[in-house]
Amino acid sequence: MIFKYIQEPVLGSLFRSRDSLIYLNRSIDQMGWRLPPRTKPYWWLYYIWTLVVIVLVFIFIPYGLIMTGIKEFKNFTTTDLFTYVQVPVNTNASIMKGIIVLFMRRRFSRAQKMMDAMDIRCTKMEEKVQVHRAAALCNRVVVIYHCIYFGYLSMALTGALVIGKTPFCLYNPLVNPDDHFYLATAIESVTMAGIILANLILDVYPIIYVVVLRIHMELLSERIKTLRTDVEKGDDQHYAELVECVKDHKLIVEYGNTLRPMISATMFIQLLSVGLLLGLAAVSMQFYNTVMERVVSGVYTIAILSQTFPFCYVCEQLSSDCESLTNTLFHSKWIGAERRYRTTMLYFIHNVQQSILFTAGGIFPICLNTNIKMAKFAFSVVTIVNEMDLAEKLRRE
């Protein structure tokens, strides 16, 4: 079953936290970013595939964009110009993020081991069902992103075929689009599909890993609510349960710290580029004459918003979860407990008050407010274009 990992929970086949990465890992495998051990048969084929992807995505596309600017810039129409300007911004941002993730990819395996450790504490059926639903949600997110991103590629390809121009104005030294239009369009679409898939992976992975973090925060909060509620248990058992909760929180914090450097670097690049991309997309709408061009631009705008808004929303929810966990811990039944329990509880409360936050480049917090501020830059781009009367000048030319 293709969509097995987005199904509702069924007893006997519940997902683990690690299963939230199934569809993401398949995409990573397609990009050649998970090299198999050399003990596996035909490992060298995958290494060749990885090399091909690196050459196409990280070498051919930047080269093609540079050569397009050098050779074809004087022949650009206004529509071609704004199509061309948007592609290098998004592509170069994706390449920089991809390089960062490739150098830090070992953090993924460490985080997945921590997922398994957190799952060990999920002994109740209710907890396992919640983990299953979180994993299914993460896989649904990957499917939705595929629909948005490759929907844009399909629309761009359709528009190119209707208009009679290659979709991304990418220079190809081997095939002349004027002589072999369909072949050039096919090559350009396949290579851009690689950068789009890379973009998808880089935009989705923070959402999935933080959603898993959130679900284990919620499960920890539920365990804290049950502390010292069973009158049949003795002080030693109550204390042991509290210690386990402290260990759970420590593991969750360590999980967040493992991912923070990678998320911080990639989101810094993304948040800086999203405002410029939205501004260029808004300006380009003024020059598109056909309905197809405007539809493609609209789908592209949705894809740009998908790069930052969902993760900023998840981080906003994570901040609320941290506050809720602090309140839950403070209002648990610890008053009247033995001294060692109260001492450990005070230590726990102090640590829990330090929220698990993600920042972009260690400069500004990743939240909805930051996303809105970066998106406002789009209005600045439009304002500059309008004040310079650039639209009318380009139309006259």
Curated annotation (Swiss-Prot):
It is a multi-pass membrane protein. Interacts with Orco. Complexes exist early in the endomembrane system in olfactory sensory neurons (OSNs), coupling these complexes to the conserved ciliary trafficking pathway. InterPro entries: 7tm6_olfct_rcpt. Belongs to the insect chemoreceptor superfamily. Heteromeric odorant receptor channel (TC 1.A.69) family. Or2a subfamily. GO terms for molecular function: ionotropic olfactory receptor activity; odorant binding; olfactory receptor activity. The gene is Or85a. The lineage of its organism: Eukaryota, Metazoa, Ecdysozoa, Arthropoda, Hexapoda. This is Odorant receptor 85a. It is found in: Cell membrane. It comes from Drosophila melanogaster (Fruit fly).
